[in-house]
Design a protein with these regions (language model features):
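Helix-to-loop junctions at the C-terminal end of transmembrane segments
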Residues: 34-55, 75, 152-153
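Hydrophobic core of transmembrane alpha-helices in multi-pass small-molecule transporters
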Residues: 77-116
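Loop-to-transmembrane helix entry
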Residues: 9-34
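Conserved extracellular-gate-facing transmembrane-helix segments in secondary transporters
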Residues: 1-6
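A membrane-interface helix-boundary motif in multi-pass transporters
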Residues: 49-52, 150-174
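C-terminal ends and interior cores of transmembrane alpha-helices
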Residues: 59-88
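Glycine-rich segments within core transmembrane alpha-helices of 12-TM secondary carriers
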Residues: 27-31, 133-149
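Loop-to-transmembrane helix entry/capping segments in MFS-fold secondary transporters
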Residues: 20-21, 93, 123-136
Length: 176
């Protein structure tokens, strides 16, 4: 459900006119938030990790939808880039806000899983069981991104962008 926003959105932003320099300029903002966010949410997550996942997944779905809207607004925002007119402040605020929400929701889900793995891991065998659970979790999280990138050119037609199809399908699957 999250793969188009995680793996395809940045490529689509570039395809629709956003320069790499703009993406690189605003990317450190959520990175800094992501560095300090675990310190603030660790006490909440440790108490009941599953309830935090129930909060994080709808937030991430909402963020994926916002990411889709930002990608769709990019051609209009950069329509006059050749004349030296950049995107509006509201577009850039929406872009950065979406990146921040994406970072928050991803960190919530990641920390919830780590806290859950910590609760179910057997301390007698050390970190082996937790490492196994984390590896399985990472594989489960990464293969949809690879699949989204692989399928994208196959479902893209001149009439309809494959990113739109993937995003809507992922959003529906995420709701179900």
């Amino acid at each position: 459900a999250f793969a188009p926003a995680d793996s395809v959105a940045t490529f689509k932003l570039q395809e629709y006119g956003m320069p790499k320099a703009d993406i690189a300029t605003y990317s450190p903002i959520p990175l800094v938030i992501g560095l300090f966010l675990p310190a603030f949410i660790s006490s909440t997550v440790a108490a009941d990790p599953i309830s935090v996942v129930r909060l994080g997944i709808p937030l991430k779905l909402f963020t994926c939808f916002l990411s889709f809207l930002v990608v769709q607004a990019t051609p209009a925002a950069y329509a006059y880039a050749a004349q030296g007119i950049g995107p509006s402040t509201s577009f850039l605020c929406g872009f950065v806000g979406t990146m921040i929400l994406h970072e928050i929701s991803g960190t919530l889900i990641f920390m919830s899983f780590m806290s859950f793995f910590n609760k179910v891991a057997d301390p007698a065998i050390g970190g082996t069981y937790m490492t196994l659970l984390n590896t399985i979790s990472n594989l489960g999280y990464k293969w949809p991104n690879s699949l989204a990138l692989f399928v994208l050119p196959k479902i893209t037609t001149p009439e309809l962008d494959g990113y739109t199809i993937e995003t809507m399908a992922g959003f529906i699957i995420g709701i179900v």
